């Protein structure tokens, strides 16, 4: 056996980077998780807009974060610590293929912060304004927070405040750096764009607008939990560490603590939210259990390597327990229409869980650390509020933050994108179909209630109760109870009242409509 | 180059634990797989209840398995083998962060057994009774099975029976320890809770109640198959083994056999079920092909490292071929309404595949092994039947196993959780809406057929054909063909018969109803 | 510390094969990605058929590829290169468990090519004909392409053409070997089976038939992107390479380049398609952004380790930009009804991205390489066209390529499989329900517009507007506006016009129908 003439660092690199690549892919997979969580909580007529915003967060975000964002974080780290900075060095990663795995690992965290925001402003924000914000949060707002913390800036042990206090800010995987940043930015956006039409009654009372598919929201939640194992446990990026003596050390205990506390926090958050929603609403609510599971995860995300297992369980339970009350406060007191409750789930749970790390720390309580935690939460929140408000205001000035009332009623899918996501179930269908006119060629059954005119060429059956005019060329069955006029050119002898007496198997229409 | 002064164990730990962590995350991802598989096979009015039960299995299950379950398994292992046991040692993992990755790896298997059960008892079991069972199967019923087998107890080589026979029970990744345990417990629950209303005709003939989305069921199946690669191949947890001579050995052949037999078993199971369902129903059925794919996976899960590749192909095909006949036997002979066929997919395929391991063993046939396999299947099944019956009976006594007939008809989403999962497509919507009264504020189009009264404030269009009374304050369009009374307070001059002649674009209502 | 007496190859094997196994699982997960992408783009009445074809691609495909396909590739490699071949050696993997992980790694690429085809021929191809093609592409058509390229054949550096030109064909992860092969085969199939009824108007103008769920299509896209990280980065299968000096080298730069170019290509493709679709249709279209994301990925899949990061960005953007124009050309000029645009996404983007590798090569431009790239694209496309045409023609001769017009109108779910995927939303339900007669026993709300007769025993509410006759035995509410006859045997006193005045809460039926 040839004595192994290898550098232990190489072995460690091999193991560590297989781990880092796989967890980066898992964290990317949180993008469809967030898209489903949000799509499920909006009405069918706005699902396409949600999908568009979530794809844009990622597609545009990675380009911006590569060309600008990652460099800005390093510069801010240097600016807010004695270390100083060098612009060329800050952007050196762009030409260094050896740095590109680390860049991807950083990018998937940045994109997570960005995609949280869309959940708060859904169903009424202008798509162009949103794109401006998505580019800015990935190019500037989030990178500043990353600079202040993970890139050695102000709040880190080597930053001005960290050096002054003698302790660095603890937020292991981004409960505040990523989630609170996204949650607070979302709250600011929801406030500035205003509530959806009908969300609050005349006297300001909350009138919930249920999403079109709780199934999608819970599926999104469980996909997020799957990706979150990459988010939390993956941030323990060192599996094999090289020791001073030239050997290797397996970081099993650290990995184990992060994996366990993530699991217990998730479980406790979901169970706590089940209990609290039963208390609030009389019955355990699946959507609140899902939000509790997420809030439990957010609450422990900053704490996972730092706290005891029972501390993680308590923090998770706390996150899950406060998510519904925090949402109610957002809606009933602040009167802010945060559609997916992102402030409650990501903002409040992230802040509370990260501030309380010292209370449950494995190494015991430290008042200084508590001071730093509270200061860190405050500084990140303040920066995010100010920066988001400025960017939303600017985007609003250029494009207008909100779509028109008419478009909001019709749905952003048609208004912003000219599409219907579920043409056979609800609403208009297909880009060729202008508003009001609908050339259904899909053989699907139409239940029309919008007065639009149908041009049917696909044998699909129509139940018309809205006075719209049909042009039938396909022998499909028409049932008219609405006085609408039928124009049939499919060989049917059109009797009175829209009854096609020959080919099509039409029932009597009792609507007195004229048919040619 | 510094000669590597490292302990080969450390290198092996690094490689092996990256593998164990990633496969644990994959096995967790089977939770949404099971949730979709079940949600797709129930009616829309019960999907929220399915999601709630699946989230509870995991969230509550991990807490119970950490505090109780894992320790119980070790104790049972000691109790049923000459080894004896020590309670403190059995629960020592709780305080040992070095043991927490292994705990998570065990927990994801336990949670898989628990979540299978809900598929059998869907659409009529009381949620509180179910929660009791979920806690007990993760805290006691499954851990006993784990103790008897994987934790060195009765059936293992070191257990009383194993020592007596001179062979240990073979079930590599849990075809019976996990899947048959879940499938049998599900059958017991389905039997004790009774069939769904309308499932059997007056003369006991089967009247299938189709699920609301075969797409979700097949998507769940393919997510399960993705996680199953972690379930099976991950159970070959040692990638690099340390040899006696202090070197390392790559377990490529063992990993390769498990990966190949898993793939061929899956494929053969699906193809066999396609052929059998064509034979049974005249046409190849996608849902039975999906169930065959799962049954093929279950059938090889215990066998994967032990059998030849063609043996795995045969076992998989056998699993896929018997799943439909086993389901028909469950329904037509046992008259048990096992909604998702969990007994056929997980119970029967698991038992048959694991019992027949010796027939296809790489090392050749062993009668003693066959005796142990059959004994093992019998003991695990018997324990599961008795324990499940006792727990279901106890839960039934405290809470009643079954929801009321009225609630079953209305749907468990509203009855147990006060929600509707697809408000724009079917049924009630939102927690504020008591049964019968519906304050639709979502702008969605309502097709009301339940006589409930509508309070509309969101401009959504109503097609009322059920005599319910509308209170409209939003200019939305009403089409009344049912004599229902409209109360319009949105500036519309309410003409006779519910025609709002000004703002709202209402068509003539020909229903003679009174409108104020 | 014992000096490590290990073979560096073993350490490298451990690390590399954990990586290869995990990425193989990720690539398998692209199967449900493709299934959702396709299911979302067809009508509800054909979703079951899409699911069936996608499950069959995988289940049958892995069996065929194990028994035949992988061996054929090796033989073709030997046949088209000076190396020659040996049949026994070509199929030696079948008995060698040490080769089975590599086999699985190859199989998941083969299955990807197969499943792309079904997206083009959806909604009208006979299922048996499709199964014949699925078996042939996995057993012969794709393996020949693999042989010509990755298995050392004609186009590789050691192949006849490669040796002649002095350069081997570059297609790192299969932009053309897998994707263009699938896309071209799909185009041939779509051409030979003919367009869907109603897809083109009388004068040949395009009449889009929108899919039933853009949400599923975008979810499928993002699942594909998740698996694609395994597809591209996983093809850099060596994480730790053993050096000549007996040491190990970490391939970080190679892995980093593939990971970065994959990410930038994906992002640029999506953003480019968003811009182009806005230009074409006036508004940014979510489905085209999703297709652009995929086309961006395809375009860089062959190029990822070979090109600069900005080259990857340009290739991705190019792929995303040409996908809509390529689709329009397919439809408007070629008049081919490629339902999911697989030729545009996988064929055109794959060809263009791979042909242009030399233009953006890290090592600089090479005219010879460009010649090889163009020749390779041409040879693969030509082989695929000829072979696919022959197989589709043969399958058509035996089974007929196309389902009947009546079946196409009714939907392939019922015609080919006897099922309805969304019974509560649209269409017939359950295998027991022959066409026209429907024994709804699911308590679901029926909106019947097809004149079929209902036998209701489950309390579900009916809105009948189609003259069909109801037999009610369950107290469910009936609303009749269609003159249909009600036969009520549930204790209701059936008044005139179908009004059950006692138990069932029926509204007045104004249809003059006779009720007993």
Swiss-Prot record, chains A, B, C:
Chain residue ranges for the region called Disordered: 426-516
Basic and acidic residues composition bias: residue spans: 445-491
Keywords: Ammonia transport, Cell membrane, Membrane, Transmembrane, Transmembrane helix, Transport
Annotated GO MF terms: ammonium channel activity
InterPro entries xrefs: Ammonium/urea_transptr (IPR029020), NH4_transpt_AmtB-like_dom (IPR024041)
Main localisation: membrane
Membrane topology: Multi-pass membrane protein
Transmembrane segments: 17-37, 59-79, 101-121, 130-150, 170-190, 214-234, 258-278, 286-306, 307-327, 342-362, 374-394
Inducing factors: Highly expressed during ammonium starvation under nitrate-rich conditions.
Site label Twin-His motif. Important for optimum substrate conductance, positions: 179, 346
GO cellular component annotations of the record: plasma membrane
Subcellular location: Cell membrane
One annotated GO biological process: ammonium homeostasis
Similarity-based family: Belongs to the ammonia transporter channel (TC 1.A.11.2) family.
Entries under PANTHER family matching the protein: AMMONIUM TRANSPORTER
Assembly and oligomerization: Homotrimer. Interacts with both GlnK1 and GlnK2 after ammonium shock. Interaction is rapid, reversible and dependent on nitrogen source.
Function recorded in the entry: Involved in the uptake of ammonium/ammonia (NH(4)(+)/NH(3)). Transport is electrogenic.
Protein name per Swiss-Prot or TrEMBL: Ammonium transporter Amt1
Name of encoding gene: amt1
């Amino acid at each position: 056996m040839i004595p192994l003439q290898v550098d232990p660092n190489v072995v460690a690199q091999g193991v560590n980077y297989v781990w880092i690549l796989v967890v980066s892919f898992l964290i990317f997979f949180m993008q469809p998780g967030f898209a489903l969580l949000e799509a499920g909580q909006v009405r069918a007529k706005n699902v396409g807009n949600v999908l568009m915003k979530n794809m844009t967060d990622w597609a545009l975000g990675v380009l911006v974060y590569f060309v600008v964002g990652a460099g800005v974080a390093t510069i801010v780290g240097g600016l807010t610590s004695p270390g100083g900075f060098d612009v060329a060095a800050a952007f050196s990663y762009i030409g260094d293929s050896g740095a590109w795995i680390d860049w991807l690992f950083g990018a998937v965290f940045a994109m997570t912060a960005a995609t949280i925001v869309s959940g708060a402003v859904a169903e009424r924000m202008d798509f162009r304004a949103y794109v401006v914000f998505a580019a800015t949060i990935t190019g500037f707002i989030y990178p500043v927070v990353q600079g202040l913390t993970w890139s050695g800036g102000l709040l880190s042990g080597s930053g001005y405040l960290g050096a002054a206090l003698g302790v660095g800010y603890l937020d292991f995987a981004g409960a505040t750096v990523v989630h609170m940043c996204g949650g607070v930015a979302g709250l600011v956006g929801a406030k500035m764009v205003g509530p959806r039409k009908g969300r609050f009654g005349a006297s300001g009372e909350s009138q919930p607008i249920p999403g079109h598919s709780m199934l999608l929201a819970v599926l999104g939640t469980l996909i997020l939990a799957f990706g979150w194992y990459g988010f939390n446990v993956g941030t323990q990026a060192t599996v094999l560490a090289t020791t001073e003596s030239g050997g290797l050390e397996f970081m099993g205990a650290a990995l184990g603590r992060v994996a366990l506390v993530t699991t217990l926090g998730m479980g406790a958050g979901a169970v706590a939210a089940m209990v609290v929603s039963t208390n609030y609403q009389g019955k355990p609510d699946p959507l609140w259990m899902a939000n509790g599971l997420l809030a439990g995860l957010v609450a422990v995300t900053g704490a996972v390597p730092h706290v005891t297992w029972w501390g993680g369980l308590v923090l998770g339970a706390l996150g899950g327990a406060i998510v519904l009350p925090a949402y109610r406060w957002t809606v009933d007191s602040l009167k802010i229409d945060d559609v997916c409750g992102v402030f409650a789930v990501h903002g409040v749970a992230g802040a509370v869980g990260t501030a309380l790390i010292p209370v449950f720390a494995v190494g015991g309580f430290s008042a200084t650390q508590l001071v730093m935690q509270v200061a860190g939460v405050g500084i990140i929140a303040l920066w995010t509020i100010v920066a988001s408000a400025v960017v939303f205001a600017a985007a609003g000035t250029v494009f207008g933050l909100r779509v028109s009332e008419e478009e909001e009623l019709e749905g952003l899918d048609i208004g912003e994108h000219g599409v219907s996501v579920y043409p056979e179930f609800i609403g208009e269908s297909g880009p060729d179909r202008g508003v009001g006119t609908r050339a259904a060629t899909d053989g699907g059954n139409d239940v029309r209630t919008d007065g639009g005119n149908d041009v049917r060429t696909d044998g699909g059956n129509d139940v018309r109760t809205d006075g719209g005019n049909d042009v039938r060329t396909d022998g499909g069955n028409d049932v008219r109870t609405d006085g609408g006029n039928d124009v049939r050119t499919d060989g049917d002898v059109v009797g009175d009242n829209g009854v096609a007496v020959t080919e099509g198997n039409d029932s009597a229409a009792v609507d007195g409509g004229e048919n040619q």
